[in-house]
Amino acid sequence: RHVGDGVVAFFPAVTFTNESNAARACIESARAIRAGTQEVAEHAGLDPSDVVLRFGLHWGATPYIGAITTSGRAEVTALGDEINEAARIEASATGGRILASKQLLEHLGRVDAAAIDIDTELMAYTQLGDLDTAPEKARRDAPSIAVCDL
């Protein structure tokens, strides 16, 4: 879903066979988009530091997902606490960082984690509210969400 100058993507476990596959697809997609953005910048003759995206990866088991029609156009959207929390994580991921919540990484199985070079047992988490890059809204609305850089 397109949101202002951002994009929200959903990775339903049912679509990816299981939760681990969905978590892996989410992480792989963020990494691929970040790499692609840098390639586009270089191809366009731009400094890669001038073309940066923020990534906030989160897990939500209970969002409302459905179709909403606005201005005669139907689009799929999701609503709920997890969606708002993901937005707070994303807002804190400055400088092209990929910030992933502990909730997301807990759904990543050992085989999928190894396939994408992640050792979930060695991850160091920081509470969102403790990040220097967390805006006031993130500090206020979701300070205790544990996140790590990927």
State where each predicted segment sits.
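Amphipathic alpha-helical segments that line or abut small-molecule/effector binding pockets
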Residues: 24-35
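Acidic/proline- and glycine-rich, intrinsically disordered low-complexity segments
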Residues: 82-88
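Catalytic core of nucleotidyl cyclases, primarily class III adenylyl/guanylyl cyclases
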Residues: 1-24, 39-81
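Intrinsically disordered, glycine/charged-rich C-terminal tails and inter-domain linkers
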Residues: 63, 73-74, 85, 94-150
